[in-house]
Amino acid sequence: MELRRALVRAAVSRPGVLLAVSPGATRQRLAVEAELARRGWPCVSGPAEADLLVVVGDREGEDEGEGEGEGEESDWVSGLWHGIPAPKARVWVTDPERVADALERGLADLARGQYEEHHEHQQHQQHQQHQQHQQHQQHQQHGDTAPHSDHRGHDMHGGHHGHAGHDMGLVEGLPMADRADDRDGLRLDVLHVPLGPVLADWPAGLILRLTLQGDVVQEVTVEPVTTPPSPRPPFWDEPWLRATAGEHVSRGNAARRLCAAHLDSLGRFFAVTGWDDMAARTRYVRDRALAGGSAAELTSLVRPLIRRAQRSRTLRWLTTGLGTLPAEQARHRGVTGPALVADGDAYSRMLVWLDAVGRSAAACDVIEALDAAETVGPRGRLDTPAPPSRALLDSLPRLLEGTEFACARIIVASLDPDLDELTHAQAPWTVHSHG
């Protein structure tokens, strides 16, 4: 019992956090990630590992992060919550300035839940022992010599957690395989696997529905999460959109945002390749850029990151040849920005990011005004009828089909589409482009 209590205290002091980020909530996500890094709380990859669910984004009809409000949340948030084993807690972050308060509230709720679960467990044991005692007396009184039940029927809710009976294609919550001809005419199992919208190091709001034969991706459907249009500009594109609208924006501020955006993408890229230490270092530099670090400081921080990534033979071996997008095809699909400049595979796109990080870090202190005609954000041109991430999303099926499933997340991370761009309602640059 003392060991169990010690383990409970350890879990509460350093809870595993599952981040569920809505499109349009990049500013809040960055604030949450920075605070989690400061506290040393780990981000987990799925509900089974989580203690604390942190939902990031606007919540209509609710005050900022207060209360549960089951009726107000989306189905995917509700599904995540029910998939987390007790004891658990949940908070909603809508204000980047109140992240610390939200996490403290979640920690308090988690501790309270641990306490309540401990006492509920004791009460359940006492109730079960009382029932067994009564049944034993009844059996003796009636001369019943049949063996006692092993109480397997008491755990009838187990099927609910596995969603058994809710979907004939599921067994204990896992999709069953169909059969179909592969490209060689062989009959192989076909498995339908969804990725997203909530995964660690994954574009917020992106759902990919994959059809697999063996470990090879045969078909891909892209389904962004439906969210209401937002009047706020996408966080990463904000400096260029403000300049286009006639506001004064310094070139240094735009360079700082570009540097942080590419560091954010690189952090995801390193994480999905299994280079966790490099991902953490990259995110630290990203946070320093957003916190206003000088050009000298940022340059001194990014140089070793760039050298280390460029010299990594393992990283090159893992990512070379994945998701090749020649410039001609990229241009035909409307792709602009780093993916067009790279004219190649996932490794080439990473190199373009690294080069842009080095140049933008050195320009963070420039005070001259940003030219309103410079409408190229981190993902590409902002003066086109569709946002640049739309073209990146449209390119995903062709890049993923025929690849191994294990490579899919690396390819997605090497493009890193920003679904915030799809939620921006009637952006000024979009209207202007039709005029």
Which residues fall in each region the model found?
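Short acidic/polar alpha-helix capping motifs at helix-coil junctions
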Residues: M1-R5, G173-L174
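Metal/cofactor-centered catalytic core regions of large enzymes
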Residues: R98, D109-G435
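Cofactor-cradling patches in redox/metallo enzymes
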Residues: L3-Q114
